[in-house]
Amino acid sequence: MSKRLQVFPWITILFYTSKSQYWNYMTIPCTPTVGYGSHNISLHPLNNSLFQDDVFEWYIDKPMVTNKLCLYQSNERIKSNLDSPNIMWQCTDNRTLILMNLTTTYSRNYYFQSFKYLGQGVPKPNNLCYNVSVHFTHQTHCHTTTSSLYPPTSVHDSLEISQSFTSTNFTHTAVHYAAGNVEAQHDTATSHTMWIIPLVIVITIIVLICFKFPQKAWNKFTQYRYSGMLAAA
């Protein structure tokens, strides 16, 4: 009778534990976690549970015995389930679950549970859920086409335009230089005329004096006047 009384508390504990795990898994929110194809991802346990609990478990899809991936008890790794298909994982000593070489089959829910096994009363599990989604990165090449409002100009056309522009500049410079020369020559001729005319006048007077032209002209004038006076008398 005493043995039955000793076994009854353990049966009650196991019953409430399984019931508590079921309802917790149904109500616990899952943290979205993104992984990338062909890479690994690490899922970490609850930090506060590492100090107060002594049983730790990792599950896939939902907390059931057949879905258990890792089991730690009394700070030791007891079990790693190798029968779960289509995924590769590793249970580390610090209670971290590592999912390796991710593919689309890893896009599932992963549950972490911990509770204190030794002690009195019904254990209350601490739960954590990760909702893993696997993404694949693809390299995309973008080609940008730039349209222009102006038609393309060939190299030959550019050279012709450049040469024409150069010739125009040269012609304009030559005309301007020629006009400047004409103006300068006109100014020079004007200045020469201004001093040549007086010089010619002076030279003419000197020549007339040398040939006694004024004396001869005066004599002619006197004779003409005297002849006029005789005719009048």
Curated annotation (Swiss-Prot):
Residues carrying a glycan: 40, 94, 101, 131, 169
Keywords per UniProt: Glycoprotein, Host membrane, Membrane, Signal, Transmembrane, Transmembrane helix
Subcellular localization: Host membrane
Cellular component aspect of the GO annotation: host cell membrane; membrane
UniProt keyword Glycoprotein present: yes
Keyword RNA-binding listed: no
Span of the signal peptide: 1-20
Membrane topology: Single-pass membrane protein
Primary location recorded for the protein, binned into one broad class: host cell
TM ranges: 194-214
Family membership: Belongs to the HHV-5 UL9 family.
Protein name per UniProt: Membrane glycoprotein UL9
Lineage: Viruses, Duplodnaviria, Heunggongvirae, Peploviricota, Herviviricetes
GN (gene name): UL9
